[in-house]
Amino acid sequence: MTQFNPVDHPHRRYNPLTGQWILVSPHRAKRPWQGAQETPAKQVLPAHDPDCFLCAGNVRVTGDKNPDYTGTYVFTNDFAALMSDTPDAPESHDPLMRCQSARGTSRVICFSPDHSKTLPELSVAALTEIVKTWQEQTAELGKTYPWVQVFENKGAAMGCSNPHPHGQIWANSFLPNEAEREDRLQKEYFAEQKSPMLVDYVQRELADGSRTVVETEHWLAVVPYWAAWPFETLLLPKAHVLRITDLTDAQRSDLALALKKLTSRYDNLFQCSFPYSMGWHGAPFNGEENQHWQLHAHFYPPLLRSATVRKFMVGYEMLAETQRDLTAEQAAERLRAVSDIHFRESGV
């Protein structure tokens, strides 16, 4: 009888953060593709675009003028998804038609005044300032809201509506679905194992190495064993850290370096500005000790085979179970094979 080989045979991998299984089909990786293709952005963007709503000194669609900022710039989203003064929804006991009020705020963070430079093209010093801004915003909003979601949608393929490099910060009066699930499952693991799930996971990955993409003094980026997206990564501190606000100065500056190395490898993989959605998850601000939590960032990039061919989460993925072709180990190997110095900086 043929012996099972995870490189050749379909199998399922369990994601302990979500409680869901992922179908891995490595034998499909060589199938021909005649479907839709993305059009990668080839144009060279200017350092300042007079028509951009996010550039320094420009007027936004609301008529508000941006200051002549020189570092990061944060403002309340002109089209915020959440409002702080939402009235209470009427109480409902209908099990099929439940509703509750959602309060919060939505902010935009411009990473720098340079319209042309995404995260991997910024200096480590500039990236350190971005991390510091994430910390400050999280600390401020965490005084009012239990959940603060820092995230970035990079590229038109991920629905980004403005090419000026920026991220967003949403704060919620509730624990969103993904956060609630991670909170519950990490708490269950902690009760059973007497240690934080992702602290244990970092040690396993450090010992294994096959899924490692970037390692610095304080940080580790891996294609997680249970990755759903082709080149998905999980960025974690090596030490136990509950929230981004708890980082030491050394961890913060080293995180900037890790972010530059990781995002540079992404861009270098297909020699393009690699699209992704990324965001931070940390312990909620709920007044509890939350020792089961470990700070981490998820990177979800859609590209699969090239700068023009992406992964679609449709059909079986929507109706049954998430499926991927490349194994996590194969994806990590491909990311390790490219330089962590951005191709535009290296002159390639």
From Swiss-Prot:
The keyword Transferase applies. The active site is at 166 (tele-ump-histidine intermediate). Changing residue 115 to N: Decreases enzyme activity by 98%. InterPro entries: GalP_UDPtransf1 (IPR001937), GalP_UDPtransf1_His-AS (IPR019779), GalP_Utransf_C (IPR005850), GalP_Utransf_N (IPR005849), HIT-like_sf (IPR036265). It holds the Pfam family GalP_UDP_tr_C. One of its GO terms (biological process) is galactose catabolic process via UDP-galactose, Leloir pathway. Its EC number is 2.7.7.12. Keywords: Carbohydrate metabolism, Galactose metabolism, Iron, Metal-binding, Nucleotidyltransferase, Transferase, Zinc. Changing residue 161 to A: 7000-fold reduction in specific activity. GO terms for cellular component: cytoplasm; cytosol. It catalyses: alpha-D-galactose 1-phosphate + UDP-alpha-D-glucose = alpha-D-glucose 1-phosphate + UDP-alpha-D-galactose. It comes from the Bacteria. GO terms for molecular function: ferrous iron binding; galactokinase activity; UDP-glucose:hexose-1-phosphate uridylyltransferase activity; zinc ion binding. Zn(2+) binds at residues 52, 55, 115, 164. Belongs to the galactose-1-phosphate uridylyltransferase type 1 family. Iron binding is not required for protein folding or enzyme activity. Homodimer. This is Galactose-1-phosphate uridylyltransferase. It comes from Escherichia coli (strain K12).
